[in-house]
């Protein structure tokens, strides 16, 4: 039987996780579910979760360049993205760019995120996807689709999308891609995925078979790996 994991959440690094979690909770209408000194979890309206991990030496990304790359960003769905963007700015965001039906901003920790128009969303924003930068978006999409038991639902020149169990992850094709080299502070991670498995040994075997690398970190209930694009991720019980 093929071993697959279950996507638990995407976690963003920040120096001030209280400020960042409160920003997203207030902007999107989401709920803070777990709060510890080094970790906060926020739950979206449809039950997805986003983590905020304390990183005292966090270096903010500087989008759109690759000297301090974004690595990850969140795509949020809202009915009335222009009004939502003004509200985000009032809460501490910075406007970065405008698209035909979306606006790109940086949150208070510097992580870019997109507010995307979707009619009829209601007062609580939706989380469409966490989007991960890659030098080969299709290859990274297939890696995670196989690891998570999800389906590749789109592939194109700009990126790829996988979906399953009510969750989606996008992969953005990036020219001149500069990978994280965690735990090297000169090339820090900006975010990571937490993936639940039933058995750490079996999960590790599957991840390595698909092209991941084991990193020298972890504990009794989790292990840390790098995906083929260098992004760290955790397998957890």
Question: Locations of the language-model features?
Answer:
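Short hydrophobic/aromatic beta-strand micro-patches
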Residues: 13, 75-77, 131-133, 194-196
